[in-house]
């Protein structure tokens, strides 16, 4: 059984440089209300650009591509997906929209992670959407000659559900204390989640839920 405790790792991350960056980010966050009011149109355009870039980058991680023109139309929900790749891009678009619009109401729980993963594949109808991996997997690298090297061995499939539950509980407990900055807790959660690698497909895209 894997247990997670964010506090020891968190304390090691509190270097002067990181503390300075956290302070600056929180200062800028306090000023953003004025920016939103004064530059609403510019902010809307930036959000749309960010959605397109996020969709492109996250799907490329999974080897999913389409043309720039098709990608833009899919993200803007102005066309119907034609291929399997486009179906998965459309699923990502909808999940990203759900998170963008309702992030305050999305708890870091196993059931919610599975729901978002299911929605990633709602257009393709993939049977593994919304289910944790059913077989063990490895993170491997293939060189130019076709030789594979195992770079990382994630948790076995049978340990995955309990590990995700444990990780989510540890994160909620850490946030609930109010003593640890979520700006550091979030990337720590994501790294542990990726190390579990809980899905047969779509793990790299699933970290966007946070």
Where are these regions (language model features)?
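FIC/Doc superfamily catalytic core
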Residues: 1-210
